A protein has these predicted regions:
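Acidic, proline/glycine-rich short linear motifs
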Residues: 42-69, 151-157
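Small/aliphatic-rich secondary-structure junction motif
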Residues: 2-54, 136
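Active-site phosphate/pyrophosphate- and oxyanion-stabilizing loops and adjacent acidic/basic residues
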Residues: 28, 76, 101, 131
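Helix-adjacent hinge/juxtasegments
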Residues: 59-87
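Gly/Ser-rich helix-loop-strand patches that form or flank binding pockets
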Residues: 105-157
């Protein structure tokens, strides 16, 4: 097995939840420490709008542009924290389908890192993981509580 084959790749899913920045920090620090890499995935949910194709196309293009901007911001933050250049992917679809596809396509992914809100509903990705992904993914999952401080994350990583 070559050194490249043994690198750990951490999959993180960009979203607008407050706990995502905790996920980004932990994955960045840990990947830096173990000589790994990060795959930053942004998922654009399927458009619900079906009346006029041209309006749907405009909405999808706006969503794609916003996703590109967010991914660039997050990739810059990963670089700032760890010095690593994240691999970035933007896909359209249902989150559980896209995550399953990415993991099936990229055999270098060793760990899925998700964030969870600690008060009430743990968040859409954790709920989806629990209901769907747990049955099809055969890899470790690290869940980062949204109430961890940066100091706690740095100590853990």
């Amino acid at each position: 097995m070559s050194e490249q084959d043994s690198k750990w790749k951490f999959l993180i899913i960009a979203d607008e939840t407050p706990e995502f920045m905790k996920v980004l920090r932990l994955a960045s620090k840990r990947a830096e420490k173990v000589g790994g890499s990060i795959l930053l995935l942004h998922i654009i949910p399927p458009a619900d709008f079906q009346h006029w194709t041209s309006v749907k196309d405009i909405m999808e293009e706006e969503a794609m542009e916003e996703a590109r901007e967010q991914v660039a911001i997050h990739a810059h933050e990963i670089k700032r924290i760890s010095g690593l250049d994240a691999e970035t992917v933007i896909r359209k679809g249902k989150s559980e389908d896209v995550i399953s596809e990415i993991i099936a396509e990229d055999h270098d992914i060793h760990l899925l890192v998700l964030g969870a809100e600690v008060d009430g509903d743990p968040g859409p990705l954790i709920s989806s993981f629990r209901e769907v992904l747990l049955n099809v993914l055969h890899m470790p999952v690290l869940v980062v509580p949204g109430n961890m401080t940066d100091e706690e994350i740095d100590k853990f990583a």
